Amino acid sequence: MNIKNILLKNVKNALKPSNLDLRNLKIKKTKFKKFGNYQIDGIFSILNKNKINLNELLNKILPIINMKLINVSEKIEFVKPGYINIFLKKSWIEDNLLKIYHSNKLGISKLKKKTIIIDYSSPNIGKEMHVGHMRSTIIGDSISLILELLGHKVIRANHIGDWGNQFGMLLAYFNEKQNLKFSEITCTDLENYYINAKKKYDKDLEFKKKSQFFTLKLQKKEKDCINIWKKITNLSIENNQKIYDQLNIKLNKTHIMGESLYNDFVPYIISDLPKKNLAINKSGNIMVILNNFKNKQGKSMGVILKKRNGTYLYSVIDIACIKYRYDFFKAQKIIYYTDSRQSQHLLQVFDIVRKAKYIPNFVKLEHHKFGMVLKKDKTPFKTRSGDTIKLSDLLKKSKEKAKKLIIKKNPNTSIDEIESLSQAIGIGSIKYFELSKNRETDYIFNWDNILSFNGNTAPYIQYAYTRVISLIKKNKLKNKNNVKFLLKKEEEIDLSICLLQFEEIINDVSKLGTPHILCNYLYDLSKTFSVFYENCSIIKTKEESVKNSRLFLSILTSRTLKVGLELLGIPMVEKM
């Protein structure tokens, strides 16, 4: 049930006989109710191009559109300087409420099925997940759920950093610390070893050479290195899975497609690109010169694939990765959720892949970049000592804060309820706060806003849901099977239109990879229901058909809030 698509299709069909170029024609929601519910956008630029004057629009074209939308719109209105406003018909709204009430998943239509790979989370092995992994993990998972709902085959790809130079450093470090017992090593230990190894790598030339030597040994899959590598990798994977489970993220071991997976395919890329005259040997380095990427001096940029010492760089692994994803999965779209600092790297990789014809032209490669998480002073979100904040510590703190809030609001809550509510509210609040922000911008992390019961927050939406559920339970329907919608008041119509707009919101989010649009919708729906609740009494209504209609609207609201939060990966609560 997509109102925008229904209106657009009808308007285009109405104008089809006129042979106009309608590619720029759009339907958008109006900002103010006095201008109707929707507007036809772009029609005036189309008419101007075809030298059609205002009189012809009013006397010929507008009546044709009106006739085509006769079952949908109450009226169509031209407003100067050049808007065509559409007022939806009440009977049409009532009929479509009935359709989505009886349909599965609120009548959301399945799209033409595509195989889409979502590359997200992708933490480095040997380090604990930190706040920097939060955006990719949470946004990528939500978009995966939404695309699955729309009927796509979604392949989740956790491109973990389980290969490369950092392992050479760790292996060299372990080689020097012969007394280490791997059975006793924790993830925290592992991260400390990496920090020590990195410091030594940056200062000690001999250790640097030793690290590069071990990186080559690992690339050659020498048994002693592979055994240690497996132990390190398994330890990190198990620790990361605990974070995913806490966050209600759908990633598991089956979704891991780390850098090591593509190691066997890299030599082919290294030999193939020079044959295609795309790569050159410059001072022993295999590299690609990209004329459409310029450095600060205006010179073409070079992307090194293999260094003279034999080690591979990330670019060649990512090239092999894209080729693999098409060859093995026949992916039609690959979406990357990484921060904006990766933009140039990914665009260069995409460029090389296209030039090498490793994927067909129809395969879409998209980088859904995101900004940084900041403190109140707009500096990177770190501890006072300047260390990155571990995600496990952040989630623990959020749960503790939620627990205190629950006890303060309702001291009589049982211990079991406090535990389940603090998990749902604490973790849900972190996720929602992240998802409610435009992913392309930086945002300030603020505990007061995250756990607030006011404004566009998880607790506000979760509480709104509990209110709706409570209302439904208190006012039992006498005839559940005789579903009928009778919209008598303006607030009922406003809520109804909001409910019918759910699918177009989901479609917009899926196209743009912007879950904050869904968060804004759920917040608006919660507010719209609150206005409806205050102005459209259910208990005091004597007319049974109107009372039932309002209860059916409440049921639809609860379903929509539930599905919406499920798509964000946020648990519902029925009591707060």
Swiss-Prot record:
This is Arginine--tRNA ligase. Keywords: Aminoacyl-tRNA synthetase, ATP-binding, Cytoplasm, Ligase, Nucleotide-binding, Protein biosynthesis. It catalyses: tRNA(Arg) + L-arginine + ATP = L-arginyl-tRNA(Arg) + AMP + diphosphate. Its EC number is 6.1.1.19. Belongs to the class-I aminoacyl-tRNA synthetase family. It is found in: Cytoplasm. It is an enzyme of class 6 (ligase). It comes from the Bacteria. InterPro entries: aa-tRNA-synth_I_CS (IPR001412), Arg-tRNA-ligase (IPR001278), Arg-tRNA-synth_N (IPR005148), Arg-tRNA-synth_N_sf (IPR036695), ArgRS_core (IPR035684), DALR_anticod-bd (IPR008909), Rossmann-like_a/b/a_fold (IPR014729), tRNAsynth_Ia_anticodon-bd (IPR009080). A motif ('HIGH' region) lies at residues 123-133. PROSITE patterns: AA_TRNA_LIGASE_I. GO terms for biological process: arginyl-tRNA aminoacylation. SUPFAM superfamilies: Anticodon-binding domain of a subclass of class I aminoacyl-tRNA synthetases, Arginyl-tRNA synthetase (ArgRS), N-terminal 'additional' domain, Nucleotidylyl transferase. One of its GO terms (molecular function) is ATP binding. Monomer. It comes from Wigglesworthia glossinidia brevipalpis. PANTHER family: ARGININE--TRNA LIGASE, CYTOPLASMIC, ARGINYL-TRNA SYNTHETASE. It holds the Pfam family Arg_tRNA_synt_N. One of its GO terms (cellular component) is cytoplasm.
